[in-house]
A protein has these predicted regions:
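Short, hydrophobic/aromatic alpha-helical segments in well-folded domains
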Residues: 5-6, 58, 75, 88-89
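Catalytic-site signature of metal-activated, phosphate-bearing donor transferases
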Residues: 52-57, 82-270
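Short, well-formed alpha-helical segments that are part of the catalytic scaffolds
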Residues: 1-13
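Short internal beta-strands
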Residues: 17-22
Length: 270
């Protein structure tokens, strides 16, 4: 449901969009849906359901086809909002020798904490007006993202961190890594607006929880499902620890979310 929206979001920011279709079986219908959207996949794979480790492997494989070029890495429900023009950030990287730019999740949720229905005509920014940080407190799922990087820079499972010389670059001790674009007080840290939380998410959380497979990170999904169940099937947007703020302006306005500087400190500590 989010793919048309994510394509539209990035189409003017990048030179090419590489869509990798991950189907569970050759007749699960996902490939037909992609083609009906007018999208020609770069690659189609058939793999077990919810194998997030395989997904990361595919990201790294595709990026390595152009190791010296810059890539934007995004799942179909992740919408980057940059603190300044993306090309300007890349120019900064080229001038200073940085090879990857990091960011963190801002969770988007509907009116009163509900999970809205989405179709290809939905204005997702208006349909999910509340922005905050509830996924990590409820499930301990990592909120860090490695967002933009040279093709040769690999990412960890979940695309949470960059890998340099076999080392995962994470935590406060790597905040000023020489190849990492400095996050600063938010002026170098990309907002990843996460539109995972639509009307289909509860069934997906339940389905992943049932797998009991390590590569699905099922325990995080189980925690999240139980937390939502205990909250009357909504997100309690009144909780201060969720940093909820209602956003009204243009979605490209990075600084509209006024809690970003404070939230950054929590994210980079994970």
């Amino acid at each position: 449901t989010m793919l048309p929206h994510v394509i539209n979001h990035y189409k003017d920011l990048v030179d090419e969009i590489y869509v990798v279709v991950y189907q569970q079986t050759k007749d699960d219908g996902i490939l037909d849906k992609i083609k009906k959207l007018g999208i020609t996949p770069y690659k189609v794979v058939t793999e077990p359901k919810f194998n997030w480790e395989k997904v990361t492997e595919l990201y790294n494989l595709v990026k390595k086809t152009k190791p010296n070029e810059w890539w934007v890495v995004s799942d179909d429900d992740e919408f980057h909002v940059y603190p300044k023009p993306l090309q300007e950030m890349i120019n900064d990287c080229e001038e200073n020798g940085y090879e990857f730019i990091t960011g963190g999740f801002i969770d988007r949720i509907g009116e009163d904490g509900i999970f809205p229905k989405v179709n290809k005509k939905t204005n997702i920014w208006k349909t999910f007006p509340n922005a905050g940080f509830f996924r990590y407190p409820l499930s301990q799922a990592c909120p860090n993202k490695c967002c933009v990087m040279k093709g040769r820079v690999e990412v960890t499972h979940g695309q949470h961190y960059g890998i340099i010389k076999g080392k995962h670059i994470w935590g406060k001790e790597n905040l000023n890594h020489p190849l990492r674009y400095p996050p600063g007080r938010g002026e170098g840290f990309i907002q990843v607006h996460h539109f995972k939380w639509d009307s289909t998410v509860l069934e997906r959380l339940k389905e992943v929880s049932r797998t009991k497979k390590v590569y699905t990170f099922w325990k995080e999904y189980q925690k999240m499902y139980n937390a939502i169940k205990d909250s009357n099937w909504k997100i309690d947007i009144s909780k201060k620890e969720f940093f909820i703020e209602r956003l009204q302006k243009n979605p490209s306005e990075h600084w509209e979310y006024t809690k970003w500087n404070r939230l950054l400190k929590k994210i980079i500590a994970v």
